[in-house]
Amino acid sequence: MLKSPYSGGHLEVIVGPMFSGKSEELIRRVTRALIARQRVQVFKPAVDDRYHESAVASHAGRTVGALAVGDVADIRAHLSGEAPLLQASAEMPDVIGIDEVQFFGPELVPLALELADAGVRVILAGLDLDFRAEPFGCMPDLLARAESVEKLTAICTQCGAPATRSQRLISGEPARFDDPVVLVGALESYEARCRLHHVVTR
């Protein structure tokens, strides 16, 4: 679909564990919007610099240009034209994509709603659960308010079943429940696991 099936602005949320293809799906949707000659702007948290500083990148290596921002205030400033250092937008995009939304604060929720109310297609991708399998950041609120939700699964590294959890590993061992929630990493720190094989040390 070049156009979303929803008329006017709306929220699309893509969730799942690490290695489930969330960024890949965001890139796919954004690329289709670009082919359809829609105005598109993609944002990513500056803290996520694993693969590329100025692009959303999938684990498979696909990329789409993105603006790295420190927080939601930076997104607002860019969209309002008050952020010369962030290449302020001349006009409101038709489509806004935001990757790794779990790293943004709760103020992302009202911004996403405002954008949708203004007629923007907002595509949000991120983890729904943290490494402890607890709801992650602002994602539960976004899921409740979205018109469209796609929950992806990965493959459990232990048994090959569909994986819905992100297993954090520290020196090869499961992380402790009271470890910091945010730890940016990839294969060196995380594995996809099913419910049965997801382990959190207490």
Curated annotation (Swiss-Prot):
Biological processes annotated in GO: DNA biosynthetic process; thymidine metabolic process
Catalyzed reactions per annotation: thymidine + ATP = dTMP + ADP + H(+)
Enzyme class: transferase
Subcellular localization: Cytoplasm
Gene Ontology molecular functions: ATP binding; thymidine kinase activity; zinc ion binding
Domain of life where this protein originates: Bacteria
PROSITE patterns for this protein: TK_CELLULAR_TYPE
Database matches in InterPro entries: P-loop_NTPase (IPR027417), Thymidine_kinase (IPR001267), Thymidine_kinase_CS (IPR020633)
Key word Ribosomal protein present: no
GO CC term (a single one): cytosol
Keyword Transferase annotated: yes
Protein's recorded name: Thymidine kinase
